[in-house]
């Protein structure tokens, strides 16, 4: 069963190949809660909730408040007793979500995580094949679903050649083809450029209008989905803090929502962060050595990047990155930004051209040729997928890995861990397993693990995704402090406020 395209239990037959239409699903929670295994406190508790068939609901809340846990519960993906403990009841159409997956479809944050097969048509057909849909129905449904989400590519088009927005629409088409009555959207635009956000938003609206499905969307920002939803539920401190029509909740609790970290329309966080530090004159030296803002730390010359020399992603890249300066790299999904970041960090060899890094201690050259010991303390990388970085059983142990490898004692490491936990709002999670954190918490931990090793050059791939207003400010201030210490920052981002 494909959890990325989460739906099961065979839908009704449709002789003309149209996706079968029916009533939206009904959602009911009574005293429901969830506690992750190994955690002392529940993520959610005492949740009472009714969502009528066809309702469109926006779920808001600060990072780590339990929004994604609620979505996982509704999708039947939280697991059994070994994963955690549930209390109360949570049902979809009167049955436990795990028994109603044919009525539930889940669209997640990461476009890459939801592509299953190599060709577009096969990917949409995959879920229906698992459900036992008649073969003569599958391909008409594939075509109808792709048309509904506005993805006009040949059925044999390679899924690897799709942009992030196209991959999200492909995942949505795969869900639509299975005919769910409940559509769950867990920050589906978090990793997309502005055009991708618009594409997915329009596709969701079309799907909802055609199917009458019940919609529950989790998002940190109100403005993306405000015109689609008719109700908002605010989750905070492990419980429901507000529930009602969107305009009414915003009017009555706007200030309280902002205090809880919700991004409201018109918010300008740049004023709270303050202006970026000016590059000092050429005589000003950064702590790591070299004239900050005038001495290159990295030179890229005629670079070709990619995973296969026969199909390069980008070529002819020339770039100079100045020491002690923050550089943001922007562009459309699929433009090769993440591939460039991996090449810059020495984790992917150049297909052609050169990457030259000059460190303060004279360790120069292409970082791809450096040993792990040479990379430590000189360069760090924050991956787009935080889970790729996690090695330890607890958050505190994760933060200790880099300093310990650098030869620091436990007495030296402990205050560093406390400092980073507090700065990023993770203190209460010090003993938690990193894999049980929310998406936003994982992102902040991944940034902290990179910063705590005190690198000269820090490369970040989408450093602010999944953050509420408050945690965004904390993360940006931490990076600003690193910049003022002389750390060179290179960030891949779609976040205009961060730029």
Feature locations, PLM:
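Hydrophobic anchor residue at the start of the ABC signature
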Residues: 172, 447
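Conserved ABC ATPase "signature" region
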Residues: 136-154, 411-429
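ABC ATPase C-loop
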Residues: 175-176, 450-451
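Conserved ABC ATPase signature
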Residues: 158-162, 166, 433-437, 441
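Helix-to-loop junction immediately C-terminal to a conserved catalytic motif
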Residues: 75, 345
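Catalytic Walker B motif of ABC-type/P-loop ATPase nucleotide-binding domains
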Residues: 183-187, 458-462
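ABC ATPase NBD Q-loop/coupling interface
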Residues: 87-100, 349, 354-374
């Amino acid at each position: 069963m494909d959890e990325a395209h989460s739906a099961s239990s065979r839908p009704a037959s449709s002789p003309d190949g149209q996706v079968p239409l029916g009533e939206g699903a009904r959602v009911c929670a009574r005293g429901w809660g969830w506690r992750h295994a190994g955690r002392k406190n529940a993520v959610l508790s005492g949740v009472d909730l009714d969502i009528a068939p066809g309702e469109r609901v926006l779920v808001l809340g600060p990072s780590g408040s339990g929004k994604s846990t609620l979505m996982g519960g509704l999708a039947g993906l939280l697991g059994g007793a070994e994963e955690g403990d549930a209390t109360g009841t949570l049902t979809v159409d009167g049955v436990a979500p795990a028994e109603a997956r044919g009525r539930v479809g889940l669209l997640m944050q990461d476009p890459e995580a939801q592509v299953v097969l190599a060709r577009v048509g096969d990917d949409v057909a995959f879920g229906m094949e698992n459900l036992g849909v008649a073969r003569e129905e599958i391909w008409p449904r594939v075509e109808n679903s792709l048309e509904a989400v506005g993805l006009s590519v040949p059925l044999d088009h390679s899924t690897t050649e799709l942009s992030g927005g196209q991959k999200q629409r492909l995942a949505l088409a795969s869900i639509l083809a299975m005919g769910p009555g409940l559509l769950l959207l867990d920050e589906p635009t978090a990793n997309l450029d502005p055009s991708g956000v618009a594409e997915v938003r329009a596709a969701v609206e079309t799907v909802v209008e055609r199917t009458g499905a019940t919609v529950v969307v989790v998002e940190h920002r109100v403005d993306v989905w405000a015109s689609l939803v008719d109700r908002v539920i605010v989750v905070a401190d492990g419980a429901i803090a507000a529930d009602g029509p969107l305009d009414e909740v915003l009017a009555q609790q706007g200030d309280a929502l902002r205090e809880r970290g919700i991004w409201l329309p018109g918010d300008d966080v740049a004023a709270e962060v303050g202006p970026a530090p000016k590059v000092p004159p050429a005589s000003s030296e950064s702590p790591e050595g070299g004239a900050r803002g005038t001495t290159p730390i990295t030179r890229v010359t005629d670079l070709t990047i990619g995973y296969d020399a026969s199909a390069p992603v980008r070529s002819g890249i020339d770039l100079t990155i100045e020491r002690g300066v923050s550089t943001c790299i922007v562009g459309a999904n699929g433009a090769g930004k993440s591939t460039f970041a991996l090449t810059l960090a020495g984790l992917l060899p150049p297909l052609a051209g050169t990457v030259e890094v000059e460190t303060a201690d004279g360790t120069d050259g292409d970082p791809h040729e450096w040993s792990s010991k040479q990379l430590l303390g000189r360069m760090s990388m924050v991956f787009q997928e935080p889970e790729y970085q996690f090695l330890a059983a607890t958050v505190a142990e994760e933060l200790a890995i880099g300093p310990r490898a650098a030869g620091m004692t436990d007495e030296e490491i402990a205050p560093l861990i406390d400092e980073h936990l507090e700065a990023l709002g993770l203190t209460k999670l010090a003993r938690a397993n990193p894999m049980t954190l929310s998406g936003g918490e994982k992102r902040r931990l991944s940034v902290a693990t990179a910063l705590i090793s005190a690198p000269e050059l820090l490369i970040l791939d989408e450093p602010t995704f999944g953050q509420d207003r408050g945690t965004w400010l904390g993360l940006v201030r931490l990076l600003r402090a690193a910049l003022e210490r002389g750390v060179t920052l290179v960030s891949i981002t779609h976040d205009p406020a961060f730029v």
